[in-house]
Amino acid sequence: MSAMNPDRPKAIPASLTRRDVLRNMGGLGLLTLTGGAGTLLGACTTAQSGSQVLAADPEIAALVDSVLGIDMHSHAAGASGRPQPAYDLAERIRVGRMTAVCLCHPGDAPVIKREPDNRIRTVRQPEPGELWRFTQRRLKWFDDLVTAQGLRRALQRGDLEAAHRDKAPAIVQTIEGCHFLEGSLERMGEVYRRGVRHLQLVHFFRSDMGDNQTEPADQGGLTSFGRDAIVECNRLGIVIDVAHATREFVAAAAQASKTPLILSHTSVAKGQPAAFSRRISPEHARLVASTGGVVGVWGSPSTFKSLSDYVDAVAAAVDVAGVEHVGFGTDNSGFGPTLAVWDDYRDFPVIVRLMRKRGFSPDDIRKIAGGNYLRVFNLSVKAT
């Protein structure tokens, strides 16, 4: 289930979702529902859907249309195999008037698990070749998805701008964790040929790329193999994502890469984060910014309880890294409800309106909501 969100209406009967109410109420000012969950009065006055924001505020609607909206980190459905999406991702991108989603599959999904304390840990070692075979299945899943939902793949410079111009929902195909390499850099060329243009180097499972934030750091940051992988990403034309990596890893990656770095999903702590935290320090954020890169703000339910909280976190990241170096990285699932505080792309106009209320200028919103990622994408991928 999605986390309860103060920017949305109060709970309503289980037979009717909050979003169903909002999308069916149209311009009505009052509605009363009775049942086991109690009574909902005046839902439209306490929260609006993205569609209602667009209809009610022409200025926000025009701004949304001018924004090339991109989520730098979202998940493909399911942990393994090729599950069917719970809903139409392309339609949600289209209704929210976004442009693209960096849609990933975690390369270590078969060997990790969320445990009762809510931490994700490695539960077993993979069999030789297992994670490569898993990735090959997921590449086929992406092929099927693009065909079934009519999505575009962003593969080269200009593709994201064209998707925005044509109002055609797009994905930047992403792998979260380079575990599929299993020591073979040649496989990077294979996933590139299959449409991958964004690679996150590490995830939860211990990687030969280097140290991650959620395991004891014992590899000195970035390994020589990790450095070679960065060079290969630069050669092929792949966006380099250092989410989940330690600060020492990121510092070495900044030296190794010829292109700016993305840190797709995190939040910036006020000081030094706790051990094994996925948050980053201000110095860590500024390190990414120093490459010309972008830090994506996630929607962690353990940290943020509303879309307003999320926008506040974006503002805090901007204060640290600068408006040219912050973006959206929701860490939601593109295909079903999650605990992420922003779990539905139809809410994009709500985010834009909240940013305006928070004091962001239209130009700043265009940068944060997608322009900054677009800059790094175009500097990283090939022209043709």
Describe the residue ranges of each PLM region.
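A metal-dependent hydrolase metal-coordination microenvironment
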Residues: 85, 92-185, 214-218, 224-225, ...
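Conserved, mostly hydrophobic/aromatic
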Residues: 73, 195, 240, 295, ...
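C-terminal segment of N-terminal export signals and the immediately downstream linker at the start
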Residues: 15, 37-74
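Mid-to-C-terminal alpha-helical segments outside catalytic/metal-binding sites
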Residues: 22-32, 343-384
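Histidine/acidic residue-rich metal-binding segments in metalloenzymes
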Residues: 87-89, 183-193, 197, 215-262, ...
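Structural preference for beta-strand elements that scaffold enzyme active sites
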Residues: 69, 100, 170-172, 198, ...
